[in-house]
Amino acid sequence: GLVERIGSKDAEIHYKSNHTKIDEVLDIPNHTVGLEKVVNFLLDEKVGVIKSTSEIEAVGHRVVHGGSTFSNTTVINQVVKDKIKKLFSLAPQHNPPNYEGIVVAESFFPNAKQIAVFDTAFHQTIPVEAYKYAIPTKFLVENNIRLYGFHGTSHKYVSEQAIAHLGIENSKIITIHLGNGCSMTAVKNGKSIDHTLGFGPVTGLIMGTRSGDIDHAIIFHLVNNLGYSLDEVNNMLQKESGMFGLTGYSDLRDIESEAEKGNKECQLALQMNAYRIKKYIGSYA
């Protein structure tokens, strides 16, 4: 199942079990209410799959940012929660709700193990020559700035499946995660050695609403010469750029459909997207 748009009066909950599928739009103001709805479905006499919450042995939590602290899937305790809180500044839009989800799950499933899976963990094997930025080292060290990478769970799974399917011992694989967020990873013998996303989730490939690589001089031009605030530029690069900025559509299915109808902007956007992907494949090969 899935709960979307938490914090909205038009939140959505999707539940599926056996031959039952339920989709509802309702007011879900916070994670507590959202998980309560999920638990109610799980326990429901007609569509539920458990009789008691004590049947749940473990709850998995996707945590976007583990910094340099977490390099593996981790059983959550108070020490782990405290460390996740210290990483809020590295992912202010993601780690706080991830943390809230952990706290709420602990209240509903007090006897279950809570497990954290970090998006950044798989990329902790990237060597220093690939993760370090060429800005003053003192600044990097004092502020924990480096390439962290994201979508690690996806890249780890895909690379493991590819290695198993191909049956090779010494492997060099390029994995590509394509969706609204996009990234590419160079994987050598099962370990991440380079990745297109960096300190944040904006660099690299062209994404649904994120810009991918741009010349950072553009940011200074927007702020210093055109009067944009840093918040406005950040919002532009995160939510108004990428395929959406080029075409007005963020979904590739819509863009492909429009391109087939002769929409020149959509055709060019697809060419740009393919070129960027090929460019990184070439650099990782």
Task: Name each model feature, range by range.
Residues G1-G67:
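N-terminal glycine/serine-rich phosphate-binding loop of ATP-dependent small-molecule kinases
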Residues H61, P92-P96, K113-F118, I174-I176, ...:
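General beta-strand structural signal in soluble alpha/beta enzymes
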Residues L42, G48-H94, I115, A121-K132:
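Short beta-strand-loop/turn "lid" adjacent to the catalytic site in phosphate-handling enzymes
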Residues L2, K172-I176, D231-E240:
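Beta-strand segments within the central parallel beta-sheet cores of soluble alpha/beta enzyme folds
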Residues F122-N225:
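Glycine-rich phosphate-binding loop of actin/hexokinase-like ATP-binding domains
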Residues N235, K239-G248, L252-A285:
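Adenine-nucleotide phosphate-binding core of ATP-dependent small-molecule kinases
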Residues P29-V33, V75, V79, P96-E100, ...:
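Conserved active-site and cofactor/substrate-binding residues in soluble primary-metabolism enzymes
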